[in-house]
Amino acid sequence: MQSIVLILILQLVYVPFLTLRTIFLVKNITFLAAIFGMLEMLVYVFGLSLVFSGKQSMLAMVVYAVGFGLGIFLGAKIERKLAIGYVYTTINTQNKNEELVRFLRNEGFAVTIYVGEGRDSNRYKYEILTKRNRETELFQIVEQFEPNAFIISYEPKSFKGGFLLARMKAKQK
């Protein structure tokens, strides 16, 4: 029974390591990806050896698979909590909301505003690049000022220059 519990625990460690390694690799954080890759393989080999050692029990194999599924869930929760990287958010409104813009800027968000031609009238587009860990906060602020706003958010692969980069360099000094 101890080995069954150990297999489950190892899967709950292995799969989040796999998730983090993949995220760091995609985000081009190679050193951490390599560290997590090494740890991932150590846990993987040890866990698999427990499943296939001695008498191969069906229960051990099922627990291994269940642990993998639970590990995916746990890894996703960890990833959301860490919120590594940046999001580029576009907000579209029917009216120019100076109060929203002022509030966002006071909260440290860099906002660029464009006027676009909609079907029936002009539309206002606000572009914001921010850290992923502030995405929920940004959405809540926009919802408070513009409940009918259309919002799109996605992760940029790379960027260069701009307000955010200058501010990050200033904080490092």
From Swiss-Prot:
It is a multi-pass membrane protein. InterPro entries: DUF2179 (IPR019264), DUF5698 (IPR044035), UPF0316 (IPR022930). GO terms for cellular component: plasma membrane. The chain crosses the membrane at residues 4-24, 31-51, 58-78. PANTHER family: UPF0316 PROTEIN YEBE. Belongs to the UPF0316 family. This is UPF0316 protein Bsph_0745.
